[in-house]
Each structure stands twice: as structure tokens, then as C-alpha cells.
């Protein structure tokens, strides 16, 4: 039987708040946990298979015997902000963390496309569901959380809307690929930015990626995923960036559909949350603790 999968992106508590800085950060954000000498935390380089390519990945192993839940941390395009600080905070609260690079990015073999990254995400989820993976790394294959930022947030939402085993999904400042061609002025601004940032990408150009998105405009508009997500726990966080309007539209659509559990927070910061990193870690850790309280508990 396939394990239940929980996809998760950084969010705050119920409702929308412009300043989600808590009065006190959780211990996992500000202090190291006690060390289990028999099962200390660790980090290892691994590969994740996808369509004949071994994708480069880093696995942060939580301390303690486990089995531990695992967070799949999806970066953006190309992903200059890898959110490594989030990985460390998440590990301190007792979860493993897997970061990987899509085919054709950051030295991973293959050619990049938006569609191939969708495939890579699904393959990474399958990897974490694999009993052999779970046994080797002391993972609980029924407790997998996916955190997605920017393009990674789009991927998290797409995977959740197409996989009925995903019980919860969250999205951080996600680009809406279905709408990036809709407004000529915004398209020009975004296109220039992408052209300047694709050095780590193999096999793709910014105009080519925009053309690919245009061919999939309807199916890649994440506002249209609201109905598929209505029975899940949905978690959203937005920033003061070019994706703000689409994130608001997704939140409105989810409310209209009567989503069973929607948590939505707005952070007054840039796309990378550059001046709110501690706040972001706090939100992530508190949300994981909230998931634990709802039955997705980690076994320390």
C-alpha cells in the first residue's frame, strides 16, 4: 500500500498576517537539540533516479532512532536560494530533509524543461515512498512532507493536485506558470530576469521556457487546482513579489471551494524572504508541530 504523502510549503497560522514574526521562536530555530550518541544527526550526498538520470541530492538525517518523517525541499528556478537554513531548522525538529536538483540543473545530468521538473518531483516522492529507501535511512514512508518555494511551490501544488495520496500541500511565493505570458509588461520583466539567471540550467532558454508554459497555460494555472485540493490541508505563504496576485487568487479560489483546512499568510518581504529568514524558519517549524498534533507525529 502506498504511504500517505503530505506536501507542505512554508505557511503561518490560520488567517492572513502581514507580519508573521512570533513573540518567541521555537527551540528548533534557536538552539541545538540533545544529541543521541547512538543515532546522531548527519548529512550525506545521494542520488535520486528520474528517467534514466541520477539527480544530485543532499540528505540531512535527523538525530534519534526514528523512524523519522522526511521533508522534500523543492527549490526554485534555477534555485539560487536553496533554503538550507530551513533544512537545518526542520532537521532540528526531528525530520529528515532531502534537497535535490532537477535534471539539467546545478550539475545534474540531463536537459531541463518545466515538464521534466514536474516528472522529477513525482520521482522524488516515489523515491521517498520506496521501502528500501525508508529502511536504509530510518524513514517513515507514510510521513513525507514537501516544501516548495517559487518554482518549487508550483511543483508542490501540481504534484498534490495529481496525487490522491497527498493529504496536505503548501506553497511558498509560487510562480503561476499558467499566467506568466498573460500580461505583456510583467512577461517582459520576468523574461529579462530569467535570461540573467539561467547559467546553472542546461538545455533550456528563457524564451523556450515561456513558450513551453504558454502551451500548457490552462493546466498550469494553479488557481484551477483549487477543486482538486479542496479535501486537503492547504498551506499558503506569499511575499511582496511578482507572484503576489496569483497567490491571492489561489487563496480566494480555495476558500470558495470550501477547502477543509486553509492556512494563509502574507509576509512583507522580497521573493527570497531575505529579511525574514528567522520568521520563515519559525513558521515552518510551528507548522510541522501543528501537523504532528493532527496525527502526522514524528517518532523521536
Predicted regions and their residues:
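The serine-hydrolase catalytic nucleophile loop
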Residues: 77-89
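Hydrolase active-site cap/lid region
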Residues: 27, 158-209
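Alpha/beta-hydrolase fold nucleophile elbow
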Residues: 136-150
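N-terminal cap/lid segment of alpha/beta-hydrolase-fold proteins
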Residues: 24-65
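Conserved alpha/beta-hydrolase
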Residues: 90-109
